[in-house]
Design a protein with these regions (language model features):
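One-carbon transfer enzymes
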Residues: 1-213, 218, 227, 235
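A short, sequence-level motif marking secondary-structure junctions
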Residues: 223-230
């Protein structure tokens, strides 16, 4: 189960490791001024690699599915769907129960965490609360961008995939949890921020955003920055 570009590295690992897979993704949507029908990156990947795919429905029952793996999927499974398809796991990009919710990678950078990781857990009716079957940590350096962390996590999943026991009953998550939020466009604005916070936001939002500021009534999008030891300031790009 996947629906955006962040799903593809995980889909690639599973495709290269399993004899047979079927991908479930979201239907095309109409977008832009011309309201053209646009397919998502996962559907494009499936078509390019001759992978069977289906469109998601909350009413679907996948009787031939041994296990299901969700990676960056845009839908929340209903209780009825979970009951009918009860062997589905999610790949969450944090060390659960820390940083539950929609923005764990970005929040880890904003929190100045020194490490994060990924968690594979059995999906239940709540959000990111199911029994954990596998976790692996990765480091975060002070100059890492979100894009670096996404790549590091998918590489770690690829390296550890064969070690994940999907038949495991898993372990309950502890009660010491934290949650992330869905960011709004206003959160990407660094105009009033200190230098330290601005730099942190630029790194955290280079995929989701980017960060921006304004100058002479123009919006300036900032994807990255560089610092020179002999410079009087920072160069934003």
């Amino acid at each position: 189960f996947g629906s955006d570009f962040r799903s593809i590295p995980y889909l690639t690992t599973i495709k290269n490791s399993e004899e047979s897979i079927t991908v479930v993704t979201t239907e095309p949507v109409r977008s832009g001024r011309g309201k053209k029908l646009v397919i998502n990156p996962v559907e494009e990947f499936c078509k390019s690699n001759n992978i069977e795919f289906k469109y998601f429905s909350q009413d679907a029952v996948y009787r031939n599915m041994d296990i299901g793996i969700s990676a960056s999927f845009a839908k929340i499974f209903s209780p009825g769907f979970i009951k009918s398809n009860n062997n589905i796991f999610n790949i969450h990009l944090s060390l659960l129960p820390e940083l539950r919710g929609p923005s764990p990678v970005e929040s880890a950078i904003l929190n100045n965490n020194s490490k994060t990781g990924f968690t594979v857990f059995r999906i239940d009716e709540d959000i990111d609360t199911g029994k954990i079957i596998f976790q692996q940590d990765v480091t975060i350096s002070e100059d890492d961008y979100a894009s670096n962390i996404y790549e590091r996590l998918s590489n770690s999943f690829n390296e550890n995939y064969k070690e994940i026991d999907f038949l495991s009953t898993g372990v309950e998550q502890s009660q010491n949890s934290s949650r992330t939020s869905k960011f709004a466009k206003s959160d990407f604005n660094i105009s009033e921020d200190s230098l330290f916070i601005a730099k942190t936001k630029i790194r955290a939002f280079n995929i989701m955003g980017p960060s921006f500021t304004s100058h002479k009534n123009k919006i300036l999008k900032i994807h990255s920055y560089t610092e020179e030891s002999n410079s009087e300031g920072i160069m934003y790009k």
